[in-house]
Amino acid sequence: MSRYRGPRLRVVRRLGELPGLTRKNARRAYAPGQHGQARKKRSEYAIRLEEKQKLRFNYGVSEKQLIRYVRKARRATGSTGQVLLQLLEMRLDNTVFRLGMAGTIPGARQLVNHGHVTVNGRVVDIASYQCRPGDVIGVRNQERSQDLVKRNMEYPGLANLPSHLEFDKNTLVGKVNGVVEREWIALSINELLVVEYYSRKV
């Protein structure tokens, strides 16, 4: 399944608030479509699927990528669900978003893909790059790159900077000081249900 490029508010209406996907809120609180307001009891599978979809759409990863992250999280020490969230949060596109350099993760991904972002002084155009403690995230020393980020900063996606990051608005330089803590993950998600969803598939 490839990355979603359709109407974002339809997804928000179905899955709830996704801070990484869009800053807009759905006016209607029920799912889109003819049967959007149906109140039938959902199966456990449907609930797990919904949590998995939240993760996919919020971070903008494909099904294939998410499976890779689940496998990687399983091999790591610690809670699989928490490690999975950390892997997604420490992606470069998400880090750029959390630093306030872009209003959404798709916007941050575009900045990265178009070569506007540097890591430790070098241009990195791979959105899935895993940021590590000590990494310095900056903006390419070109007027266009600087202007793009400054404009984005006028409309930040999330108000608070996570505790593992620091950012200097004057120099447009951020630093990764550690790994994100669970309490700083902005998405409302039950990661255990995602792990359960993949338990027989991965």
Swiss-Prot record:
SUPFAM superfamilies: Alpha-L RNA-binding motif. It comes from the Bacteria. InterPro entries: Ribosomal_uS4, Ribosomal_uS4_bac-type, Ribosomal_uS4_CS, Ribosomal_uS4_N, S4_RNA-bd, S4_RNA-bd_sf. The keyword Ribonucleoprotein applies. Residues 23-42 are annotated as: Disordered. GO terms for biological process: ribosomal small subunit biogenesis; translation. SMART domains: Ribosomal_S4 (SM01390), S4 (SM00363). Residues 90-153 form the S4 RNA-binding domain. GO terms for molecular function: rRNA binding; structural constituent of ribosome. Keywords: Ribonucleoprotein, Ribosomal protein, RNA-binding, rRNA-binding. GO terms for cellular component: small ribosomal subunit. NCBIfam families: PRK05327.1 (NF003717), rpsD_bact (TIGR01017). HAMAP family: Ribosomal_uS4_B (MF_01306_B). Part of the 30S ribosomal subunit. Contacts protein S5. The interaction surface between S4 and S5 is involved in control of translational fidelity. Belongs to the universal ribosomal protein uS4 family. One of the primary rRNA binding proteins, it binds directly to 16S rRNA where it nucleates assembly of the body of the 30S subunit. This is Small ribosomal subunit protein uS4. It comes from Microcystis aeruginosa (strain NIES-843 / IAM M-2473).
